[in-house]
Amino acid sequence: VLGGGAIYGGGSRCSAAFNVTKGGARYFVTAGHCTNISANWSASSGGSVVGVREGTSFPTNDYGIVRYTDGSSPAGTVDLYNGSTQDISSAANAVVGQAIKKSGSTTKVTSGTVTAVNVTVNYGDGPVYNMGRTTACSAGGDSGGAHFAGSVALGIHSGSSGCSGTAGSAIHQPVTKALSAYGVTVYL
């Protein structure tokens, strides 16, 4: 699975954000409201399990981590959905005014600008804190996808208000919090 690629679990489709590593083991991070749904994740609908949930945090946060159990060593890249990929070499927190791209399995790659950070978002299941808000278009199924700027990982896609005109917004969980929570790092 590449960053931004589709993942399936518990009858739902989400997206992976970034492939990460710890002690030689490979994982991907995604949205916590996705990993809350299922322990087992596949790369195709009804397909064989490629990874198993090792942690999930939602609400308050919106991140989770899945360990690859299929023996694969996936590239630490994000799918640009045009036949090419973006290498990810570091992670950082988004800043207001920053140009950002989102890769997810529904709306593919969309672009926008970071409009706010440290935002509290009230979902039906409870609030999540310290989120980033961007103008990138997104939709259901993009959840867990990658928010990035060049080779820098910025966020895990959490939710959106859709793609309507200039009012579109995509909310992300800052990825640095997930990386530190699980002791994992992005890799080339």
Swiss-Prot record:
The keyword Heme does not apply. One of its GO terms (molecular function) is serine-type endopeptidase activity. The keyword Hydrolase applies. One of its GO terms (biological process) is proteolysis. SUPFAM superfamilies: Trypsin-like serine proteases (SSF50494). It catalyses: Preferential cleavage: -Glu-|-Xaa- >> -Asp-|-Xaa-. Preference for Pro or Leu at P2 and Phe at P3. Cleavage of -Glu-|-Asp- and -Glu-|-Pro- bonds is slow. InterPro entries: Pept_S1A_streptogrisin, Peptidase_S1_PA, Peptidase_S1_PA_chymotrypsin, Trypsin_dom, TRYPSIN_HIS, TRYPSIN_SER. Its EC number is 3.4.21.82. The active site is at H33, D62, S143. Coiled coil: none annotated. Monomer. Preferentially cleaves peptide bonds on the carboxyl-terminal side of glutamate. This is Glutamyl endopeptidase 2. It comes from Streptomyces griseus. The lineage of its organism: Bacteria, Bacillati, Actinomycetota, Actinomycetes, Kitasatosporales.
